[in-house]
Amino acid sequence: MIKELEEKNLLTESDGCKIVNLDKYGLPPALILKSNSSSTYITRDIATALTRKRDYNFSKNIYVVATQQKLHFEQLIAVLKEMGYEWANDCIHVSFGMVSVKDDLLGTSAKLSTREGNVIFLNDVLEKSVEKTLEIINERNSALENKETVAKEVGIGAVIFQELFNTRIKDYSFDWNNVLNFEGETGPYVQYSAARAYSILEKNDFYSKINNLDISKLFNYEMNVDELALVKSIYKFEDILLDSAKKYEPSILARYITEVAKLFNKFYNSCPINNQEESIKDFRLVLTYCSRLLIEIGLGLLGMDTPKKM
């Protein structure tokens, strides 16, 4: 790779070091070799990018690295462009902000930083979350079957959702009171909404009837305000997925799933299913089914489970 840079007349000597001038990009020069001829991070990243393209012929080469490394990746991409590689534009820096904590795991609120020694291991966070979730389950529903499994699904999911709900480039504070809140814009809230939907469907024996349900009979159903709002939100799912993927922004999906959960709960509270005419009951069961299915798919894309009971 160094030889290629030399052959393309891209290396310039500066104070005994070898650099690539990036003035045309409005960037400081990229340090390729130190004065003792040792390599740098960007040297190794250039070589790695070349190897990945050769071995995998990637369509996108995505670097998920903290915002603080923005300049580094701007220089990396600029050097690849200077080397004449059009695929340099397919190298994407997906940056993210910092996390501070308010918890006895660290004892103080501080930015997580390996260099400063302010570190929590992810396994410790996940184990703590599962432990706290099990305590909540024992307080609220101690008779729940498989509660240890549910605690794991909800506890781990809560941490994932908290991370992905926040816009990725923004710093945020990790607080157990928010993460494990069953009533806020959280993973447990969304998972509980899906469990509620499953309970309704199970009580009405919906899953055994679904294959014989004549959906065409529901086409002329006149929806009320809450039903229509939920249907409109569900209809946006495909566009939300495309937008989230295009922008490398999982928070778009996480916030959308939360919106659907809120609208479903509003529908649940205002639109009774039992003791209704058959057409009304069938429509509301189908809408409940679609809501749960959407939440389950959405959470799955975020790496979360969807418990049937909570």
Show where each model-derived region lies:
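Non-catalytic interaction-recognition regions
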Residues: 1-310
